[in-house]
Amino acid sequence: MIDIGAGSTEYLVCTDGVVRHTGVLAIGGDHISNDIAYGLKVPLGRAEQLKIEFGSAVVSSENPGETIGLSNDEAGMMPTKVNREHLHQIISARLEEVFIILENEMNRLGLMDYLRNGIVITGGVSRTKDLQRIAERVFQLPVRIGESPDIQGVHAVREQP
């Protein structure tokens, strides 16, 4: 299981109810937002919004040059539109980096055989469009997005995988 949260990525390898390995990478969704802010020259808050509303883990050749219009509701100089393909390239590069680091770690520790039934990805970043596709490409294993248990309480909490 891989849990990609805002500030970190936690992972757990478990078979037959036995935990084989756990670990943490200090890379998470906030790093993707920082990359977007830097790469597209937009404020961090706007970068987070772009990631959530328009982000994808896969760069598509459909509609090359398509742009996303930005309202000018923030002070300072910023672009009025950004290239959708560039946004997706930034997201894809960071996610691919995370998955390659994890795959290298699993290979180094001899744990890939424990993952043959597949990988479950959870956390806020798991909601990124096409995340499953990039993970399957890197790991060469089946990947699924984990679902939140049906819990009582704040509605927003239940929407988080």
Positions of PLM-derived features:
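Helical "lid/coupling" subdomains associated with nucleotide-phosphate turnover
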Residues: M1, E10-P161
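Short, glycine/acidic-enriched loop or turn micro-motifs at the edges of active sites
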Residues: A6
